[in-house]
Amino acid sequence: MSHIEKQAGELQEKLIAVNRVSKTVKGGRIFSFTALTVVGDGNGRVGFGYGKAREVPAAIQKAMEKARRAMINVALDNGTLQHPVKGAHTGSRVFMQPASEGTGIIAGGAMRAVLEVAGVHNVLAKAYGSTNPINVVRATIAALEDMKSPEMVAAKRGKSVEEILGK
C-alpha cells in the first residue's frame, strides 16, 4: 500500500460519531471523548480514523490525522463498484453491490459516509448484525479493499481482461 501525501484541502472529511466515555477513579469520574471520522478524495481513496482525547476538538483532530495516514485505494468502475462485495468486522457484516447510473447511494449511517468520501455515486448497500459505527466502518473498508478490478484479476492470473470477462 503506497502512501501518497495529499493536501488537506483536496480531501473530503466527515465526522461519523462523537462519544463521551468515562473512567471511574477513587475521586469520581474522568470524562473523555472519542471521535470516528472518514476522509477521502472522492476518487477512490478512503481512510478512517478513531481519536480519543479529553476535549471534543482534540479527539476529532486526532481522528482526522489518523484517517489521512491510513488511506487505501479502491478500484471503482464509473462511480460504482466492480462487483458485489461482502465485508465483516466482529459482529458487523456489510453487503454492497453495484447499481446503475442515477440510483444514488442507498446505504445507512456510517456506511453512507465511507462510500460518499470514497467517490462511489451509485451503490446498493446493507449492514447486517451489529450497527456499531466503528465496526460498520471497518467492515465497509474491508469489503472495499477486497474488491478487485478485472485488470487486477487478469494480471494476477496471467490472462487477458477479455478472458476474465468472458468476451
UniProtKB/Swiss-Prot annotation:
The N-terminal domain interacts with the head of the 30S subunit; the C-terminal domain interacts with the body and contacts protein S4. The interaction surface between S4 and S5 is involved in control of translational fidelity. Part of the 30S ribosomal subunit. Contacts proteins S4 and S8. Belongs to the universal ribosomal protein uS5 family. One of its GO terms (molecular function) is structural constituent of ribosome. Residues 11-74 form the S5 DRBM domain. With S4 and S12 plays an important role in translational accuracy. Located at the back of the 30S subunit body where it stabilizes the conformation of the head with respect to the body. InterPro entries: Ribosomal_Su5_D2-typ_SF, Ribosomal_uS5, Ribosomal_uS5_bac-type, Ribosomal_uS5_C, Ribosomal_uS5_N, Ribosomal_uS5_N_CS, Ribsml_uS5_D2-typ_fold_subgr. The gene is rpsE. This is Small ribosomal subunit protein uS5. It comes from the Bacteria. GO terms for biological process: translation. One of its GO terms (cellular component) is small ribosomal subunit. The keyword Repressor does not apply. Keywords: Ribonucleoprotein, Ribosomal protein, RNA-binding, rRNA-binding.
